[in-house]
Design a protein with these regions (language model features):
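Transcription factor C-terminal regulatory/effector domains that mediate ligand binding, dimerization
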Residues: 1-185
Length: 185
């Protein structure tokens, strides 16, 4: 898939024919790359997010099958500070995909609202919205909070996700400003 995308982008570049559809594909790919990259940093494999019944290895109340976690433990010394598990992550059973976001308060907001959230809808809105936009974009290293941007419509629909996460808006507005867009409030 990436080889075909690369070839098509190369052709359009040399034909001086920019295609905005490629930006949408690239932003979706970057979010997936970021989630998978942070999973790897956490010592988790892709099968972890494919298993609907998987539980985070950070939760002290659950035993994680070794098939989902490479060493059945994580190395705190090598985890970026932004991915260090919070008290909520350690105390509330949750799916490991929620551990992938580099904003601790955002992770806590998601975990605390688990019962009332359609996680399939949330995941779709993050990765592949029906309106053609993505809810989150990643512009750099996935473990760096400043690499992540939330879209305007995502903030409107899922405002509680970033409640108390002022830095998310600061970083998002930085990226929006670089593209000449108005800042989020």
């Amino acid at each position: 898939m990436m080889a075909r995308f690369d070839a098509a982008a190369y052709e359009r570049y040399y034909a001086a024919d920019p295609c905005l559809d490629h930006l949408l594909t690239l932003t979706k790919f970057n979010v997936l790359r970021a989630v998978l990259g942070n999973l790897a940093t956490l010592g988790l494999g892709i099968q972890t997010i494919e298993d609907d019944d998987a539980l985070s290895p950070f939760n002290s109340t659950t035993k994680v099958p070794t098939s989902h976690h490479r060493d059945n433990h994580y190395e705190r010394s090598i985890l970026p500070a932004s991915l260090e598990p919070t008290t909520t992550q350690r105390s509330v059973p949750h799916h490991p995909w929620l551990d992938c976001f580099p904003h601790p308060r955002m992770r806590d907001n998601l975990i605390n609202a688990l019962e009332g959230v359609d996680d399939c809808e949330l995941c779709t809105d993050i990765m592949d919205s029906a309106n053609g936009d993505v809810g989150l974009m990643v512009w750099g290293d996935p473990w760096l909070p400043q690499s992540w941007e939330v879209s305007e419509w995502f903030v409107q629909k899922w405002s509680w996700v970033i409640e108390g996460c002022e830095e998310v808006l600061v970083y998002s507005n930085y990226w929006r400003d670089r593209r000449g867009l108005e800042g989020l409030r």
